[in-house]
Amino acid sequence: ENMFRKFLLACMVMATFTMQIQAISINELNSSSQFKNVYQKSYPYEGGSIQNKLISYLNTYSVESLEYAAPHYKLKGTFYAVYETPRSASITEYELTATYDTNYSLGSLIQAMNLVKPSASMYAVIKAAQDKSGIQVELQEVKRYNVDGTEVISKVPLEHQLRPLDRGRFDEDLFAVADAMFAVAYQQHFDDIVVK
């Protein structure tokens, strides 16, 4: 019985020291090399000169490969979206699973257009890229925080999406995060890959 108690105590101590810190603050996001600012955008607040701001930070240590079967890849990672308005600021933690088809990277599309028609116009390449980005995402909101790192308890349901990414303005933040995950995993940007 005494040996069992010692075992339980040892397990509790191990669990305490191996648990990841769950809370995240704006200071951590800005100061730790583990978090990379991969997207930032300011836009006017209610038509005035005061700006709202969205900043996305990728936890570079969280990126893991789930599938590697070129030209198809699947990665999973965690990122934090910081929303700043004139009145408040908040942090939202997301888990992003991105499935990549490099047949649709800009490099591959340009290569394919040149094979079909040697002087492919950039318009045709851009049109093809807009029709299909080559990235499908599953986005799961995990937690919400105040900028000091305290968790926000809310009755608002956590967001969940499963959909293809658009290369346009609507998804430019998620595209930047998915591209940064690809660069962390493979040391190359998604659109630089050329499938021959």
Stretch-by-stretch model annotation:
Residues K6-M19:
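Sec-dependent N-terminal signal peptides
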Residues E1-M3:
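Short, Lys/Arg-enriched N-terminal segments with co-localized hydrophobic residues
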Residues A23-K196:
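N-terminal secretory-pathway/extracellular module detecting exported/lumenal segments
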